[in-house]
Amino acid sequence: MGPTIDGIRAAAERIRPYVTETPLLRADVLSAKLGADVWLKNETVTAVASFKIRGALNTMLAACSEGVSEVGTSSTGNHGQGVAYAGMLLKIGVNIFMPKPVNATKAAKTLHDHAPI
């Protein structure tokens, strides 16, 4: 079964205390080119500069409610950063598995959020 509007609303409510609202910006040039209103959600203003924090928080909050105290994931960057940041916020253990060679910038941000790689 896929996502439902009720499930999406529940997830939004669950993560609300942990995320900031991001701006919705009209893409004027793209709108003119396509002859339609095009709007872009700017997720680069989040703590991890990606929407990935939203999914990580939603999943980890649900896991915490079931007693999970440590999680692991495999990621080349943005998802790992989201999980690391969520782990820091929720005070649960996180292990991030990244392929070699590791992107130095993404690894540094992940380590900054206290997640071992």
Q: Can you name each region flagged by the protein language model?
A:
Residues 1-117:
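PLP-dependent amino-acid enzyme catalytic core
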